[in-house]
Amino acid sequence: SHSTLDDLEYYIDLSKKADIPFIIDTEGSQIRTGDLSSDSYHFKENDKILLYKKKIIGDGKRISIRPSQILEQLKEGDILYVDFDTLVLRINDISNISNGFIESTVISSGYLGKNKGIVIDPQISRRFDMPTLSNKDIEAIKIGLKNNISLVAASFIRNSNAVNYVRKISNGKMKIISKIECLDALENLDEIIRESDYLLIDRGDLSKEIPIEKIPFTQKIILNRANNQDTDVFVATNLLES
């Protein structure tokens, strides 16, 4: 998910030479910042940032957001947490969505980098329509199939339909590791376990959607549910920090 398609085959070749199993890790249905003309930009409180649907090279005044359809679902007042709360934005003007952009205001200063995850305020009860796989993910899976890669870690899986879609795209030739890292996944946990080959608990991303003090308890619930269905689980990220 953090590599380019051009780099992917190179990394696959390295893993084969080292005789290490390789896993295709998808971006999944996560909102991310686009490319920037610099490694990062610093924004102060009350700065304005234009958020664009189309792919642009961002700068100190405007950035692109993907998937593009998410901008059409945002409303004025919505809060966006960028890169583990490094930067916090509030949507303040959506009147230009027909022109391909909306306006946000910085409410907590910080740095913005390229390809960084964005979380919409979990207190917002609306459900957002997000693709299970990005176009880049689909191409990465094709490269994996061509190179006989047998594992795909599917990020931000939200329900069993998403698992089945990944299985369809991989032609049923890859074992699916469903990553549990959002509220929807917790609500649909049993059906996700049923359709998956393995689970992965992403404690870091999950802590952006539920209070961090609930992570150990939630982790235990997921492990118990998976054990009940004889499904193996990876426990990943932010282990040493707690």
PLM feature spans:
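Non-catalytic helical/linker scaffolds that mediate oligomerization, partner binding
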Residues: 1-242
